[in-house]
Design a protein with these regions (language model features):
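Extracytoplasmic ligand/sensor domains, especially the bilobed periplasmic-binding protein
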Residues: 344-347, 351-441
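Segments of small-molecule ligand-sensing domains
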Residues: 560-631
Length: 682
C-alpha cells in the first residue's frame, strides 16, 4: 500500500484541474483571464472544436477519465501551440484521476511548455508534484513548487498552488509551515464561506501542535501567523469556563486588531467549545483491588487522584469506586453505577472486561476504558479506550524512520504474542509508507546469549558458511573477515532494558555500528542511568513526555509523585502518567471525537482519538548520548487515513488557456500578500 491511500485531496485537486483547464471558448468572446490590456489587439479565437471539447469534459465529469484522456490527446494532436499543450495537460489530469500514473507521467514528459506563458509551466509543475506525492517523494514534490507563481497567473491557480504546498508540508509533518501556507492562501480567497473553511483548516492544523511548541515558536504581535498560533492556544486551553474564554478572545482581538480571522470563526469556535466540553459531576471508577492487575490499577489510581486534586474543590466530580477484580462482574457494576447516578465511568482495566462493554450494544453513559481491544461489530459509540499501546510505539518508530529518509529495514523482536503484535504493527505501518522490511528475527527473552538471531539477521552466518565452503573446496585456510548484509538502512527492535543493553552491543560488534537503531520505549528504564545505558549509545526511541521532559516543580511531575508515593514500583511509573491523563481526558473526549485532528497535550503523550474512539499517543523522541536520553522532541504526526483539513474546500475554477500571442495579458489583481520574512518567519 502506497502513501497515496492517505491523500484524499488528490482526487479533488485533479478534478479541479480537469473541469476548468479549458473553459468553453465562444467565438470572439473573451474569457476572464484573457482580457487584453486596454488598446491592444484581441487574442485569436480558439481553434479547438467546441463539441469535442464539451464531450471530453462530459466524460471526465461522469467519471470516464480514460476516455476523456484519450479524447483530450486526440484533440491535442490536431491543435497548434499553445492549445496542444493545454489539452495535453488536461489529459494528464484525467490520467491522474484514473489512477494511471504511468500514462500521466509519460504524457507529462511529452508536453513541452518552453516559451509559453508562465501559467503552463506552473500547471506542468503542479502535475509533476502530484506524481511525486503519489510516489511518496515528498521532498521532490515540494521542490517542484518552490518557485512562486508569476504575477500574471490567475488568483484561482495561485490558490491551488498554496493549497497543494500546504498539503505536501502537512504530509511531511511540517504543521507550522503548512498552516503558514494556508495563511497565504487565505489572503487570496474572497468568498466568505470558502475563507471561513480555510481559516478552520488553519486552526485545525495548528491545534495538532502541543501548547509548548506553539508558545516557544509564536512570533510577537501583531503578525498574522503569531495571531493564528495564539488563537490555537486559546482553543486548546479551554477548560469549561465560557466567561474566561470570551475574555481571552476579546484580549486576543485587541492584541491582533488587523488579523484576518473572521468574526464568524471566533464565534463558531466559542460556541463549539461550549457544546463539546463535557462537565461530569458524578464519576464512577472501576478498577481491580486484587489479582494480577491490582498493582497496575494502584499506579493508575494514584496518578488519577493526583490530577483530581489539582481541580478546585467546587469543580471536582463526586467519585464512586467499584472493585472490578472479577471481569465477569463488569456489566453489573456498570449498571450499578448508572443507577447510582454516575455521569461517566472510568475503567475497567481488564481486556475481557472492556470486551464485555464493547459487546453490550448501547451504553447509557460514556465509558473511558483503561485498555484497548480489537474493533468489535456494533461497538457502542460512547465507549472510549485508552491504553499505553506498544502498537502505537511500533507504528511511530516506522514513521520516524521514514521521515528520517530510510527505506530498508530489519527487525528483531521477542518471541510470543507481545513481540508478534509489535512486529505486525511496525511492518504494516512501514509497508504502508512505502518501506521494505527485508527480514526479521525473534529472540528468546529468557536466553542468556542473543548472538544467534543477530548473526542471522545480519547474514553473518551465511558469510561464515561461505567461508567454510571455500575452505573445504580449496583444502586450505582462507583469509576471511565477516561481512554483514549491505542492503539495509536501519534496525528496529523491541526489548526490555536488560536485553536491549546486550542486543545493541552485539549489532555494533557484528559490523552494524553505523546502522541507525530505532526501538520502542521499553528499552528505557524510565530514569537516566549513564553507566548502564552507555551500551545503548545512538539508539532512538519514543517515550512519554512525563519521563523525558516533565515540567520541573509541577505538582504532577515525576519527582512530586515519587514523593507522594515513595513505595511505588518503578516498573509502573508510566501508568502514573496515564492515570493523570485519564482524568484530564474526560472533559475533552467529545471535542476529540468530533475532530480527529485536534489533540490534548497529555503527560503520556499528545493525545488524539481515531474513528473507533481509541486514544492514541504521539510520543516524544529521544536519542541516547553518553548514556543519557537527549530529547529530540515530538516527531511530526504522519497522516493515516484522515481527511486533511482544508481538503473539502469549495471547488475553484481553473484559469483558461492563454493564447499563443505576443500581446501581453493584463495580470489578475492580487491582494497584498506578505513576502517571506514580513511576518517574523519561524
Amino acid at each position: 500500500m502506497q502513501l497515496t491511500k492517505h491523500i484524499p485531496i488528490t482526487g479533488l485537486f485533479c478534478a479541479l484541474l480537469l473541469t476548468g483547464c479549458v473553459t468553453p471558448q465562444l467565438p470572439k468572446v473573451l474569457q476572464p483571464d484573457d482580457a487584453p490590456v486596454s488598446g491592444q489587439e484581441q487574442p485569436p479565437v480558439s481553434p479547438v472544436p467546441q463539441a469535442e471539447l464539451d464531450r471530453a469534459t462530459e466524460l471526465a465529469l461522469t467519471g470516464d477519465y480514460i476516455a476523456a484522456a484519450a479524447l483530450y490527446q486526440s484533440l491535442a494532436t490536431r491543435m497548434p501551440s499553445p492549445y496542444r499543450q493545454d489539452l495535453q495537460l488536461q489529459a494528464v489530469a484525467s490520467f491522474l484521476l484514473a489512477q494511471d500514473t504511468e500514462s500521466a507521467s509519460w504524457l507529462l514528459g511529452q508536453t513541452d511548455v518552453t516559451g509559453l506563458p508562465a501559467v503552463f509551466d506552473l500547471r506542468k509543475r503542479m502535475h509533476a508534484s502530484e506524481l511525486a506525492i503519489r510516489n511518496s517523494k515528498l521532498k521532490e514534490a515540494f521542490s517542484l513548487l518552490e518557485a512562486l507563481p508569476a504575477e500574471d497567473v490567475s488568483i484561482d491557480l495561485q490558490q491551488r498552488y498554496h493549497r497543494q504546498r500546504a498539503q505536501i508540508l502537512r504530509l511531511e509533518g511540517n504543521l507550522l509551515e503548512s498552516a503558514r501556507e494556508l495563511g497565504l492562501l487565505d489572503l487570496l480567497i474572497s468568498d466568505p464561506v470558502a475563507r471561513l473553511h480555510n481559516q478552520q483548516a488553519i486552526l485545525q492544523t495548528l491545534t495538532i501542535l502541543t501548547d509548548g511548541v506553539l508558545k516557544i515558536l509564536q512570533p510577537d504581535p501583531p503578525g498574522i501567523q503569531g495571531g493564528w498560533m495564539e488563537l490555537a492556544r486559546i482553543i486548546k486551553g479551554y477548560e469549561g469556563d465560557p466567561a474566561s474564554t470570551q475574555l481571552l478572545l476579546t484580549q486576543w482581538r485587541e492584541r491582533f486588531p488587523e488579523h484576518p480571522a473572521r468574526p464568524a470563526l471566533l464565534e463558531g469556535y466559542y460556541q463549539r467549545l461550549q457544546t463539546q466540553y463535557r462537565q461530569v459531576r458524578d464519576l464512577a471508577v472501576l478498577l481491580p483491588r486484587s489479582g494480577a492487575l491490582a498493582d497496575a490499577a494502584t499506579a493508575l489510581l494514584n496518578g488519577f487522584m493526583a490530577a483530581y486534586y489539582q481541580v478546585p474543590a467546587a469543580k471536582r466530580p463526586q467519585l464512586r469506586f467499584y472493585d472490578s477484580s472479577n471481569a465477569a462482574d463488569t456489566w453489573p457494576l456498570y449498571r450499578q453505577a448508572v443507577d447510582a447516578g454516575a455521569d461517566m465511568v472510568i475503567g475497567p482495566l481488564n481486556k475481557d472486561a472492556v470486551l464485555q462493554l464493547a459487546r453490550a450494544g448501547e451504553l447509557q453513559i460514556p465509558v473511558l476504558a483503561l485498555n484497548q481491544i480489537p474493533p468489535q461489530m456494533g461497538q457502542p459509540e460512547n465507549l472510549f479506550q485508552f491504553g499505553l499501546s506498544p502498537e502505537d510505539e511500533a507504528r511511530q518508530a516506522a514513521e520516524r524512520a521514514w521521515q528520517d529518509g530510510l527505506s530498508q529495514a530489519l527487525a528483531i523482536v521477542p518471541e510470543g504474542a507481545w513481540g508478534e503484535r509489535i512486529l505486525s504493527s511496525f511492518r504494516d505501518r512501514w509497508e504502508s509508507l512505502g518501506g521494505t522490511l527485508l527480514e526479521y528475527q525473534t529472540y528468546d527473552a529468557k536466553a542468556q546469549d542473543f548472538s544467534r538471531p543477530v548473526l542471522t539477521l545480519l547474514d553473518i552466518d551465511e558469510s561464515e558458511q561461505r567461508r567454510r565452503e571455500m575452505q573445504r573446496v580449496l583444502i586450505q585456510n582462507v583469509k576471511y573477515e565477516p561481512r554483514r548484509r549491505q542492503d539495509v538502512d536501519f534496525v528496529f527492535f523491541a526489548a526490555k532494558p536488560q536485553i536491549a543493553r546486550q542486543i545493541r552491543p552485539l549489532l555494533q560488534f557484528h559490523h552494524a555500528a553505523n546502522l541507525p537503531i530505532y526501538a520502542t520505549s521499553h528499552v528505557y528504564a524510565g530514569s537516566p542511568n549513564p553507566k548502564q545505558d552507555r551500551d545503548l549509545e545512538g539508539l532512538k526511541f519514543p517515550d512519554i513526555p512525563w519521563l523525558l521532559a516533565g515540567e520541573k516543580g509541577s505538582r504532577l511531575s515525576q519527582d512530586a509523585l515519587a514523593a507522594l508515593f515513595p513505595n511505588a514500583k518503578r516498573i509502573y511509573q508510566r501508568l502514573y502518567a496515564m492515570g493523570i491523563d485519564s482524568f484530564n481526558l474526560i472533559p475533552h473526549l467529545e471535542r476529540l471525537k468530533m475532530s480527529p485532528w485536534e489533540t490534548l497535550d497529555g503527560q503520556s503523550g499528545n493525545l488524539y482519538l481515531d474513528e473507533i474512539n481509541q486514544v492514541h499517543r504521539r510520543l516524544m523522541w529521544a536519542q541516547i548520548r553518553k548514556g543519557i536520553p537527549d530529547v529530540l522532541g515530538y516527531a511530526p504526526r504522519v497522516e493515516s487515513g484522515l481527511t486533511t483539513p482544508g481538503s473539502d474546500l469549495p471547488p475553484l475554477i481553473f484559469p483558461t488557456v492563454v493564447p499563443n500571442t505576443p500581446v501581453p495579458l493584463a495580470p489578475s489583481p492580487v491582494p497584498a500578500v506578505p513576502t517571506p520574512g514580513a511576518d517574523k518567519q519561524i
